[in-house]
């Protein structure tokens, strides 16, 4: 346990004598790939291309139009779902299914 604590302290020490941190797993015959952290720092400011516009606008204090559109889409989906459930229930209740069909596997969700 003491060895693990000592190793953790060694890993947390800042860079000394201008040495770069090397990735773990490097052994004999392994050539370091260079400073990859510098490359990551260059790419970090360009992250916004991966985020949908709706999230960027909301994060920047958007005017709420996107939320209104989203809520309208959700209402439309709920309306269509209710319509499909009701249609299925009416079909079962009206007896449009053939008489030899087993009704035990049918179900009806009433809104």
From Swiss-Prot:
Domain of life the protein comes from: Eukaryota
Q: Where does Zn(2+) bind?
A: 108
- Span list, region His cluster: 100-104
Free-text comment about domains: The nuclear export signal is required for export from the nucleus and the interactions with itself and NGFR/p75NTR. The histidine cluster (His cluster) and Cys-108 mediate zinc-binding.
Record keyword Phosphoprotein present: no
Q: Mind listing the UniProt keywords for this protein, alphabetically?
A: Apoptosis, Cytoplasm, Metal-binding, Nucleus, Ubl conjugation, Zinc
Chain segments carrying region Interaction with 14-3-3 epsilon: 68-111
* Major localization class: nucleus
A Pfam family of the record is BEX
Q: What post-translational changes are documented for it?
A: Ubiquitinated. Degraded by the proteasome.
| Similarity field | Belongs to the BEX family.
Set out the biological process GO terms recorded for this chain's protein: extrinsic apoptotic signaling pathway via death domain receptors; negative regulation of protein ubiquitination; signal transduction
Protein name per UniProt: Protein BEX3
The compartments listed are: Nucleus; Cytoplasm, Cytosol
Q: What is the lineage of its organism?
A: Eukaryota, Metazoa, Chordata, Craniata, Vertebrata
Q: Where is this region: Interaction with p75NTR/NGFR?
A: 68-93
Asked if Coiled coil is a keyword of the record, the answer is no
- Specify the species: Homo sapiens (Human)
User: One cellular component GO annotation, for this chain's record?
Assistant: cytosol
């Amino acid at each position: 346990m003491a060895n693990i604590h000592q190793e953790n302290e060694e890993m947390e020490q800042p860079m000394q004598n201008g040495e770069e941190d090397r990735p773990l797993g490097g052994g004999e015959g392994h050539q370091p790939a260079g400073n990859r952290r510098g490359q990551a720092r260059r790419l970090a400011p360009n992250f916004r291309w991966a985020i949908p516009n709706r999230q960027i606008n909301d994060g920047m204090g958007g005017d709420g139009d996107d939320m209104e559109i989203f809520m309208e889409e959700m209402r439309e989906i709920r309306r269509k779902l209710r319509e499909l459930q009701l249609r299925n229930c009416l079909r079962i209740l009206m007896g449009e299914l053939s008489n030899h069909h087993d009704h035990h596997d049918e179900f009806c969700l009433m809104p």
